[in-house]
């Protein structure tokens, strides 16, 4: 026993002496003491870590579908929960991975899932409202004040340039945010910078009385908005687990749709003296208000969303020349893809042409609308409010019934073509002798319903035209060009019709023709 206790005390003294020894003496073996053969043996036994480079956001199907719905699709389509999911071979439902794990590798807790759903819905609402106000009301008012009789031509030119710039910026920002490595993550820095740029540009825009400056700062506004919308769409596809993506997508769509209505009503309410030169009740004041709203949108969205993890540790890969636009190449050996592409392009043209010139239509294209009243507003402001609310009600009703409508027909072309016919009937109503204000309200109601049905049931038809399920993300990126081309066609053709005839009502005839072409092309899909 005495010998054992002495041995134990000796070991304790040795351990204490080792712990108290200098750092240089605590490492008995260093690399210098190993032979080259020993180093090679250790290297063979060590586990070689080869971390995978994260998938590019412009190749993720969920990201592309989110962008399509955000830019020119119907946001309430996701609220219908149609069984037409975008195929994705990376989905956890196709293997034994936990569906609670997001594509970025994180596993959010239940409170974090609620924060993700609320954050993306709130971001969609708060960012959509100012942009809807600017696009539909404030920019047309500013151009009308500065251009006078040339306002339609100038607005068409600004719309064309803005659409092309947005396309280029989306391609650049998607690659730039994918290759951002910092403690704040890949998407958060872009959202912060985009919010600052957008709010600053709108604030400066409110003080511009020179048309070239208006064009410059409006384009800066679009750049800033692209810096927000593209990273938000990428974050939505990466951070929301597969199990909860449908619910989060539905609430994001509701937020975007409600933001469109709220933005238009707020804009016309704040500009009851739009043509005056002061600040009270003018376009200048409204722009300053929405510039502050953009700041609130950025701060609130980032605070509600769980903080994004650091991207500093991610494996880095250089940017290649083809990374920017290679995803826009259409799939080979898919003739039906081009038919579906053209159908969507003309459907977008039918809706975008009316949306661009809607303020001028309400102001000068419907005759005497001074008796129209809603929400304490009258005249053109009331007409804009009525159309916004009617379109929202029609879209919401269609979203609630879309599941039943889609399941009632084995051939998805039948409800899609029926929706095209209903849309054509809706846009013809303002051309009839009935009361113009009532006609545009009915148009907004029926057209909102028809477009949601068409957008929802045509998704399955469009996905069926894609030849390879392994490249759905790239195919959807190419398909998203239909939004760009459709917006260009709608802006240019409607501007030509107004300039030649001087009648704003002819934009409804253009819309009817475009949607009729979309219906015929949809009939060719199978």
Per-segment meaning from a language model:
Residues 35-163, 339-343, 347-372:
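Helix-loop boundary and gating motifs at the non-cytosolic
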Residues 206, 297-306, 509-526:
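Multi-pass alpha-helical transporter architecture, strongest
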Residues 170-184, 397-411:
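Helix-to-loop junctions at the C-terminal end of transmembrane segments
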Residues 192-209, 421-435:
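C-terminal ends and interior cores of transmembrane alpha-helices
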Residues 139, 227-240, 453-467:
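Intracellular juxtamembrane helix-capping segments at the cytosolic ends
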Residues 470-500:
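A late C-terminal transmembrane helix in Major Facilitator Superfamily
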Residues 186, 271-292, 496-515:
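A membrane-interface helix-boundary motif in multi-pass transporters
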Residues 166, 249-268, 480-491:
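Glycine-rich segments within core transmembrane alpha-helices of 12-TM secondary carriers
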